[in-house]
Amino acid sequence: TPPVYYDNTLYAGVALSENHIPGGLVIAADATTGAIKWVFNTVPQGPRDDGWEIAKDSWGDGQKVGGGVWTPPVIDPELGLVYVNSGNPSPDYDGSARPGMNLFTNATIALELETGKLAWYYQTVHHDLWDWDHVTGPLLFDVTKDGRTIKGVAAAGKNCLMYLWHRETGEPINPMVET
């Protein structure tokens, strides 16, 4: 994806492949030297990847593939966060090789700008079999609800739904009922 520039750093999402290659990446690089500052793998492969403790059991013993980042990241300098939307797990047509929820695919992910550490995530489709990942980059907005202003982030999915979260915490702005 095209990189986003902020404070002498380039932030880019990477979609390595739809199939057969582990995870998508979010990379921060020094805009002057090109030196990599940090890397976040949307499908953690082992204990060295941030988020491994949260995601490891969500793949069972299956292959950990997919999660490409197809759209540019979005930066909130006030909160010190960068937001990305991750793609579907792979293969998307046959989930038998990847039991579980398959974190952090089909998710909006907030990372700390300076370190790339996971701040929060929200997975919209668990164990996706339908290729229902997000089709847009994250959108930052402010909205007034019950008389107070909420800093929000939105994502649109291929399932024709628009998801809205609190930018700082990842909590849904409106209830999201799973059936």
Which residues does each predicted region cover?
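Noncatalytic, solvent-exposed loop/strand surfaces
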Residues: 1-179
